[in-house]
Amino acid sequence: MFKNILIIGFGMIGSSIARSVIKKNKSIKIFAFDKSPNLKIRINKSKLKRVKVLKSLNEIKDQNIDFIIICTPMLQYQSIFKKLNDIDLQQTIVTDVGSTKVNIEKIYIQKKYQFNFIPSHPIAGIEKAGLENGFDGLFTNRYNIICPIKKSSKIHINKVIKFWKSLNMKTEIMSAKEHDKVLSLTSHLPHLISYSLVLTAMKKETSLNSKLVKFSAGGFRDFTRVAGSDPEMWRDIFLANSSQIQKLTSNFISELKEFSRNLNKGNSHNLLTKLKKLSLIHI
């Protein structure tokens, strides 16, 4: 197991990783690097005093970091990769928690970066951002998708898998392309729909606003909860996986238009047939 772990980007996901590692293994040292100027104060207030803050990534060698987890928004990856590549990381494995993989793999391969990179994506999270909202148990019984690059060492892949399993995660290996196709449907499009629905509700008359909150059922509340996710993170996800999301968006709009046509025509038979068919689907 790793001895010295650096978490780059110490938000909700990063702090949850730290909490889980600290609870399960008292001997592992945890380091954090983040652009937040008050990081050390916030970490201490969050009862994470075992986490040491690095002022610069140049301290990686001095601290004998053997495992790096990138937990930043994805548009920051390119800058981070460049900095990591300037450091001798032959004995270090780098992974990430990003929600898209094709774009990240492309950057790594095109720039011919040399550090040992094993992309991963823990399918876990809550809508609240910030290290204060992290908690131990976030990853328990959740899936983590590992997306090895062609030149990835099996030894390194297995070490990354072992690490995530130590946090009680289930792991699955996929190609970057397959990962992005699956997640565009199960996560990215639903988030886009949530934002769109809440925007639609916000544009209704002001007089309706209080009633929307008062009489919203579970479904609408779920949409508003999802729409409350970290804006910067989701902007990056939408842009990074835009081609897959745009294809699905077109399909989704077509389905909405068909529902609208049936409603306009009062076509009870078509509506009932479609709804009955969908009622048989259980995921």
Where are these regions (language model features)?
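Redox-cofactor binding/interface segments in oxidoreductases and associated redox assembly factors
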Residues: 69-70, 95, 146
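Interdomain hinge/lid region at the active-site interface
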Residues: 209-276
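NAD(P)+-binding Rossmann beta1-loop-alpha1 motif at the extreme N-terminus of oxidoreductases
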Residues: 1-62, 67
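Residues at the starts of beta-strands that form the adenosine-phosphate
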Residues: 4, 29, 116, 143, ...
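Rossmann-like NAD(P)-binding element
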Residues: 58-88
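Rossmann-like NAD(P)(H) cofactor-binding subdomain of soluble oxidoreductases
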Residues: 80-132
